[in-house]
Curated annotation (Swiss-Prot):
The lineage of its organism: Bacteria, Pseudomonadati, Pseudomonadota, Betaproteobacteria, Burkholderiales. Residues 53-238 form the BPL/LPL catalytic domain. In the reaction, the free carboxyl group of octanoic acid is attached via an amide linkage to the epsilon-amino group of a specific lysine residue of lipoyl domains of lipoate-dependent enzymes. Gene3D superfamilies: Bira Bifunctional Protein, Domain 2. It catalyses: octanoyl-[ACP] + L-lysyl-[protein] = N(6)-octanoyl-L-lysyl-[protein] + holo-[ACP] + H(+). GO terms for molecular function: lipoyl(octanoyl) transferase activity. Catalyzes the transfer of endogenously produced octanoic acid from octanoyl-acyl-carrier-protein onto the lipoyl domains of lipoate-dependent enzymes. Lipoyl-ACP can also act as a substrate although octanoyl-ACP is likely to be the physiological substrate. Keywords: Acyltransferase, Cytoplasm, Transferase. NCBIfam families: lipB, PRK14342.1, PRK14343.1. It comes from the Bacteria. This is Octanoyltransferase.
Length: 248
């Protein structure tokens, strides 16, 4: 998350319940537009490091220029083409290597898990369910895979191909990083890596599955499902705006 591949890195913390009757604040959704990965990475770490018990939870929606990200225990050998021209950024999430680029929705979840009384595994399940429900809204069947967080095509010619990646970091009981969903993108950069550390893993987007979906429409559907799965509440107002999508 980056949006990011397949595992969760967690700093040990006791996940305790919020005080009895304490309301959970609504999630604020921030539509950050096209943004360099490093800018998002620095901003989410700063947000997490400076938040207090009263800081509201946020969901950031962004589209990145081409970039590979490698998890903190990732093996650089999974980058198969060293001179691809796509920059590589080492990050503090779990998992191996993944790719972000235009036409992909990246969502960062900046949540206080203790206040929400959420265990990490439950959060992962809620995120995966939101992606599955979003794809179902476009008549695409998708599934989880045991031991490999992310979402995969359920049937057809591309059965087993990965369409969404997931990777989180938990610090002081709060999450950052998040998920990516491939809508309509140039998939060739995935051929220069072992996606999420799996040699030969096929990666697809919604366009590969004959769905001509608009990036903004899918993003709004996905955010709606995430918020509904987290707490059923409405997001705090931060007016969404259309992003300019590149077909590069």
């Amino acid at each position: 998350m980056s949006v990011s591949p397949v595992s969760i890195v967690s700093t040990p913390v006791a996940v305790s319940a919020s005080p009895a009757g304490a309301p959970v604040q609504p999630v604020t959704v921030r539509w950050r537009g096209r943004e360099a990965y490093e800018a998002s990475f620095d901003a989410m770490r700063a947000f997490t490091d400076t938040r207090t018990a009263d800081t509201g939870d946020e969901i950031w929606v962004v589209e990145h220029p081409p970039v590979y990200t490698l998890g903190q225990a990732g093996d650089p050998a999974h980058l198969l083409v060293a001179d691809s021209g796509v920059p590589l950024v080492k990050v503090d999430r779990g998992g191996q290597i993944t790719y972000h680029g235009p036409g992909q929705i990246v969502v960062y979840l900046l949540l206080d898990l203790r206040r929400r009384k959420l265990m990490v595994r439950t959060l992962v399940t809620k995120i995966e369910e939101a992606v599955i429900e979003t794809l179902a809204a476009y008549n695409l069947a998708s599934v989880r895979k045991a031991g490999a967080p992310g979402i995969y095509v359920a049937s057809g010619v591309h059965e087993g191909a990965k369409i969404a990646a997931l990777g989180l970091k938990i610090r002081n009981g709060c999450s950052y990083h998040g998920l990516s969903l491939n809508v309509k993108m140039d998939l060739r950069p995935f051929l220069a890596i072992n996606p999420c550390g799996y040699a030969g893993l096929e990666t697809v987007d919604m366009a590969s599955l004959a769905v001509a979906a608009d990036w903004n429409d899918v993003a709004h559907t996905l955010v709606g499902r995430l918020i509904a799965n987290l707490d059923g509440a409405s997001a705090a107002a931060d007016k969404p705006h259309a992003l300019e999508q590149s077909n590069d």
